[in-house]
Amino acid sequence: MLDKIIRIATRQSPLALWQAHYVQQRLMANHPGLQVELVPMVTKGDIILDTPLAKVGGKGLFVKELELALLDGRADIAVHSMKDVPVDFPAGLGLVTICERDDPRDAFVSNRFTSLDQLPQGSVVGTSSLRRQCQLRERRPDLIVRDLRGNVGTRLSKLDNGDYDAIILAVAGLKRLGLEQRIRSPLSPEECLPAVGQGAVGIECRLDDETTRALLAPLNHAVTETRVRAERAMNTRLEGGCQVPIGSYAELDGDSLWLRALVGSPDGSQMVRGERRGPAALAEQMGIELAEELLAQGAREILQDVYQGNPPA
């Protein structure tokens, strides 16, 4: 088994490379002597930087090229941010490992202000996420929310250049890049419900590659997997992509799961929220039931309005 070289398909952004190196190190620590190589590549989401993500349209903006590399044999595994992973996979591929989750929260980042509540009326806040935008606008309709694209370094540069008074980024991404000092205050799930799978790293591979799947098995984190599968089951039932105003967050206490979710209109005028508590063994069923509840409360109409501009296919 150890004469095999594992090739990791990864995006070229600093954060994606951090995640790929993390998986590389975990594999080599669990299997001394195993050779693991990175295969960096560029995705559609990396190329189109002058258009809001929601307007680019489509699921899997950051993963399709990596999946092609798996299918044609250029790579053995692909490493993703779980929040970027679509609910559907090409035939023959699947999500086989979810690593231990890091901090799932969003971060308020500013050079002048310490918290969202401290921002004066009319302040400009940058984020490319419809999920963040709808929650920001609901909480602070007096703010000007503008789109913000690019990798973490690019976004911070735009803040430092004075284009924005504050920006919202993922806590986990800043920590992984050694930029934790830029966080002025984390936003609790009550303030801003995270994206599905936020803070977790997922590994995709060919489902018939039993050798690679066996090598990956020790990297799977059971608690994280249960939480993320509940969140993803809800997202699947809502037919949500990664660029839709959907938030979901599951917490596990022993065998008891608490799942929260929301669907909002991008302008923040409509927000549908719900939650479920139940046994962890029913994580995916709870996700589906919570999605049904949200759809019945008006989430279907909100999402249809969003998809009319950007189909989720």
UniProtKB/Swiss-Prot annotation:
GO molecular function, one term: hydroxymethylbilane synthase activity
GO cellular component assignments: cytoplasm
EC number: 2.5.1.61
S-(dipyrrolylmethanemethyl)cysteine PTM positions: 242
CDD domains for this protein: PBP2_EcHMBS_like (cd13646)
A Pfam family hit: Porphobil_deam
Catalytic activity: 4 porphobilinogen + H2O = hydroxymethylbilane + 4 NH4(+)
Cofactor note text: Binds 1 dipyrromethane group covalently.
Role this protein plays: Tetrapolymerization of the monopyrrole PBG into the hydroxymethylbilane pre-uroporphyrinogen in several discrete steps.
Subunit annotation: Monomer.
NCBIfam families in UniProt: hemC (TIGR00212)
Protein name: Porphobilinogen deaminase
Organism the protein comes from: Serratia proteamaculans (strain 568)
